[in-house]
């Protein structure tokens, strides 16, 4: 197995990563960490009082794991029917089936650090989105 110190962008090769450390060290809003043929891992850093933005992935299931901070997570069949939100903390996981509207808001006082697994991949390999315009 590849245990490369610079794991991000391993091009779908088998690899071992300290995903908690990689997630905590990430300062980009979104950074692709690994992309295979059927799955992808991204790291996110969401500033206080910001969110990922209401979104839906029609053809991708998603697992979002909170590594640092606390969040409010909303789900719904439509954008207008999203629930008021459930509290999620470090160590919690959000399981989001394809076709589900969702949003994750940083409700804490420190940056929210999460990693996300998409199946199949959702973002282009090598994606780095340094910031998000926060309109929240």
Region spans (language model):
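Glycine- and acidic-residue-biased ligand/ion/polar-headgroup-sensing regions
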Residues: 59-77
């Amino acid at each position: 197995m590849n245990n490369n110190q610079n794991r991000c962008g391993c091009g779908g090769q088998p690899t071992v990563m300290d995903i908690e450390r990689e997630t905590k060290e990430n300062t980009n809003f979104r950074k692709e960490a690994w992309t295979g043929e059927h799955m992808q891992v991204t790291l996110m850093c969401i500033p206080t009082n910001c969110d990922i933005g209401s979104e839906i992935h029609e053809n991708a299931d998603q697992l979002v794991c909170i590594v640092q901070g606390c969040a409010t997570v909303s789900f719904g069949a439509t954008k207008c029917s999203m629930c008021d939100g459930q509290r999620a903390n470090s160590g919690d996981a959000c399981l989001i089936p394809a076709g589900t509207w969702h949003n994750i808001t940083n409700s804490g006082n420190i940056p929210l650090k999460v990693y996300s697994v998409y199946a199949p991949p959702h973002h282009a390999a090598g994606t780095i989105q340094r910031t998000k315009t926060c309109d929240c």
